[in-house]
Amino acid sequence: MRLRHLLAPALALPFALVACSKPEADAPAQQPAAAAPAGATRPVAPPAGAPHWDYETDGPATWGTLSPDFAACGAGKRQSPVDLVGAKPARLAQLLTSFRPAELRVVHHEHMADVVNTGHSVQVNAAGGDTITVGEERFVLLQYHFHSPSEHHVEGRAFPAEMHLVHKAADGRLAVIGVLFEEGAANPALEPIWANLPASKGVESHLPHLTVDADDLLPVSRASYRYEGSLTTPPCSEGVTWIVMRAPVTMSSEQLARLRGVLAANNRPVQPLNGRPLVAEGIEETVAR
């Protein structure tokens, strides 16, 4: 196990986390799935009765109308993702990660098994025991998954891909670490995942002979943007603390092509900040556009 932290000087800006309504009802692509037998694959069924949504016909512009449970997608004022522009410099509460190598479990999960070419994601389920601490708040890693292209922008710039590491506190509050990917050198930390991407949607692969350390997927610098937002998929529940790493990490053009080979575009457009505080470490103060 490795401990990595970002120390906060005197001025710490804790975030008041609001409990998410039904965090367990996040997109199936963001649900921890039951384990498959070692070395095997198995189908993963969508939740019974879950409203269909996707990134095309029933895409982001319609999510708020598809179900009363999705109302926040259309009416919420603290939604994610956002364009990370105009951040105020700040000394932030300590961020500490405690991740360790874990057996590889990869899910290529479609929202609805009976609909072809709908939105989906590639997800890695955590084995348990991995945590982050934000100030004095402790969150357990549930899973991490990928979006392409990125959901968050930085000063108007989109990135080829983005990873979300979803964490949950004992009281149900959520914190998500966002990692932006730019095209460049091959990323060896991705290879165990990329080499075992399930070719079929709705399938989980359990590969106990391979391990992945989520810490290796994060940038060396832990400087971040932070703001209060929401889930980026229905039900778009608010009260999620977002910690988006300022430094992107790389993946090669070949790695990006492999991801896109199994992952259709699954990014929600950026949402209005609506006056929410957006803070960041290690920046000069900028003026919002």
Task: Give the role of each language-model region.
Residues R2-H5, C20-R289:
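Alpha-carbonic anhydrase
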Residues A8-A16:
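Bacterial N-terminal signal peptides
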